[in-house]
Amino acid sequence: MTAVTRFAPSPTGFLHVGGARTALYSWLYAKSQGGKFVLRIEDTDIERSTQEAIDAILEGMEWLGLTWDDGPYYQTKRFDRYKALINEMLEEGKAYKCFMSSAELDEIREKQKANGEKPRYPGTWRDRTDHPEGEPFVIRFKNPLEGKVLVKDHIRGNIEIANSELDDLIILRSDGTPTYNFCVVVDDWDMGITHVVRGEDHINNTPRQINILQALGAPVPEYAHVSMILGDDGKKLSKRHGAVSVMQYRDDGFLPQALLNYLVRLGWSYGDQEIFSKEEMIELFSLDAIGQSASAFNTDKLIWLNQHYIKELPVSEVLPYAKWHFEQQGIDVSNGPALEEVIKVQADRVKTLKELAEISGYFYQEYEDFDEKAAKKHLRPVAQEPLEAVKAALMALSTWNAETIHEAINKTAETLGVGMGKVGMPLRVAATGSGNSPSLDVTLNLLKPEQIAQRIDKALIYIANRQQS
């Protein structure tokens, strides 16, 4: 049997990290088994579903590299299929029309609560045939009254639920639209889904869906209900814990490789291994190795992984993501050194790609002002002579590379009888606008001699103005 999994988000918001982890687990299982991964958009909640949310989900999946083999399918385009099956179930006595109003049902539920009973529909219209003409109705599934439902779960083991605990589920609303629980069942059947990986909040739906599948004569898939993700305070992950949208992590400068590696470890493990390439995930992943307990989201751990991937991935893999961040900050990387070279020299110095773009602008455009703290400390009148001397030494170079630049700076310090810092730090502030950069010879080598000359002149003007004020 070929494994077929699915990710089936509701388009009522962005793709959050919990949904992304579910999608990843589904995708990994399909790939590990040589199977198929289906993307389905469960948009039956017409009032809350938006095209903007659909676009955000698709964008998030594509950015993560979780490509789908089939789909995306949309439930709203399959209403005719659902209704045809509901009519068949009506004819076969597996479903029935219920004319109970919402007010009547609310009244019954309040009485049940007052009596300490579980609120539920009492089956009033289950066997009635005295249907009032012209009155609104819903269609309910005739859930079995006796016996048990067995849910075979890869994560939680076998779960048994007595049918007496389940009421008759609405499968068609009074406005003629099918409900979520029915659409899911039909879709899983039609799409040949063999393994359903989803959040633990769906456990209560599962026995109902199994009963509908069996009533339709459809095969029952295997299930894996994943525990929720908590914040570091032990509460359900929410916006107060930081970013929860996948694309917010992109905007904040995280690599998809880092986020995937982090998400796969939120519940699944393979020995003590922390770093997993996508290929390793596919090779090693199994549903049975997912833990039952909830996982806590730790942003510091994600940042550590992101730093690792920025440093360790081939520059060619980091390049397109880095370039996007430079573009977001209005930096044209065609106006300077090859971005690959900038990534190489900055990779050890940054936690995110957003930070990379923020601290590397001076390679591609003129900085407006000096960093105030750095200029105050290093662009003092005493720095005028070293700057003038090192400018002359650098401009006299016939060959411009890191080695000759390093030698010129060293010789300038020796000639002036001062330490390297007395030359190097003012030069660094002049060249970059700040007191932080990769090694000075490497930094200057990525810039042009004429840029260095202009920036040293800018620093000398700053010093002169400082003397006059």
Curated annotation (Swiss-Prot):
Its protein name is Glutamate--tRNA ligase
Q: What's its EC?
A: 6.1.1.17
The highest taxon in the source lineage is Bacteria
Q: Where is this motif: 'HIGH' region?
A: 9-19
The record's subunit annotation is: Monomer.
Swiss-Prot/TrEMBL catalytic activity: tRNA(Glu) + L-glutamate + ATP = L-glutamyl-tRNA(Glu) + AMP + diphosphate
Q: Which family does it belong to?
A: Belongs to the class-I aminoacyl-tRNA synthetase family. Glutamate--tRNA ligase type 1 subfamily.
Q: Where, by residue number, is the motif 'KMSKS' region?
A: 236-240
Role: Catalyzes the attachment of glutamate to tRNA(Glu) in a two-step reaction: glutamate is first activated by ATP to form Glu-AMP and then transferred to the acceptor end of tRNA(Glu).
- Cite the PROSITE patterns for this sequence: AA_TRNA_LIGASE_I (PS00178)
PANTHER family listed in its UniProt record: GLUTAMATE--TRNA LIGASE, GLUTAMATE--TRNA LIGASE, MITOCHONDRIAL-RELATED
Report which gene this protein is encoded by.
gltX
Q: Where in the cell is it found?
A: Cytoplasm
